[in-house]
């Protein structure tokens, strides 16, 4: 089997991005919900602790602001939306926003370190599945992972 046969993205996706680019349609976008993360990965720039976020708050958007941006983006043709952070599951209004965005018709991907995925999260995603869940795997084993992320491997 060749690598091209292992490709999971449908050919339609490539066509959509090509057509959107020619028509100047913003087909995909990213919402960085919060800089807060429960890991301290050495290479990451969005890894503030809860205390750091509280002590040095940046102007974080409210759920209403994110929804307003999403409505504008959707009206312009955006279809694919990546939710990221920090750890997006730590953002207090994550589930409410996720549900709104899903109902707006976005194809949602989520970047997560996976540490907060439990039965509750799985059940939520079963009810309203994201298009993709990207779980970071930084290390060949527990030791290298823990060394890099400062979290249990």
Indicate residue ranges for each PLM-predicted region.
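Conserved alpha-helical substructure of the radical SAM core
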Residues: 2-132, 147
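Histidine-centered beta-alpha loop that forms part of the nucleotide-sugar donor binding/catalytic region
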Residues: 113-114, 137-140
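Active-site adenylate/phosphate-handling loop in enzymes that bind or generate adenylated species
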Residues: 143
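Glycine-rich S-adenosyl-L-methionine
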Residues: 149-153
């Amino acid at each position: 089997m060749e690598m091209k046969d292992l490709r999971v993205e449908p050919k339609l996706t490539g066509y959509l991005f090509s057509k959107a680019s020619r028509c100047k349609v913003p087909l995909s976008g990213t919402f960085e919900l919060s800089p807060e993360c429960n890991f301290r990965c050495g290479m990451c720039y969005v890894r503030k602790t809860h205390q750091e976020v509280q002590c040095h708050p940046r102007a974080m958007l409210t759920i209403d602001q994110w929804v307003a941006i999403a409505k504008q983006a959707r009206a312009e043709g955006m279809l694919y939306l990546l939710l990221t952070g920090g750890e997006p599951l730590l953002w207090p209004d994550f589930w409410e926003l996720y549900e709104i965005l899903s109902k707006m018709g976005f194809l949602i991907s989520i970047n997560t370190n996976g540490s907060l995925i439990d039965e509750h999260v799985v059940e939520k995603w079963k009810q309203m599945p994201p298009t993709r869940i990207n779980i970071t795997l930084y290390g060949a084993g527990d030791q290298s992972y823990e060394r890099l992320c400062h979290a249990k491997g």
